[in-house]
């Protein structure tokens, strides 16, 4: 089995209907597919996920689309937070692991490929930042971040949490001391999954 899908299978074993969808921009599907997110890493990516959920009634009758959780790590963490902030009508709880929250703070070799130079045109960065959406949170959100993350630095989660607090929006933050972008310690990784499971069961009922 592909190790990338192990955690998804584990959540399925716990009774969840698990859906994995490659949205516009997912690597490995050709340059035209990647160009679909040029100057906007948010809108089309999110709408692709919404479209998949809308088709679930036909694809998987057991799925309850009134109780949808979304979880992800890194870009997937960004997408999970984006989903509950901008489409809380569709996504009812989110788990954002090591999320980018403002692309201005991420590596330029990645961001400028898709969003251009912010010194020339900052509009794509402003439009895809989660900071301006903090006031919109109406769904449960769990933020997880390794404090030693040298890829997506912990400042991303800290600034989003600060913005949510300033907007009076309750949320949960799980800092991982000594952990980098991923969690190499098996015991920590296992307990992290159990924590996410508890969060989803508690918030989705």
Residues of each region from the PLM?
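Serine-hydrolase catalytic core recognition
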Residues: 1-205
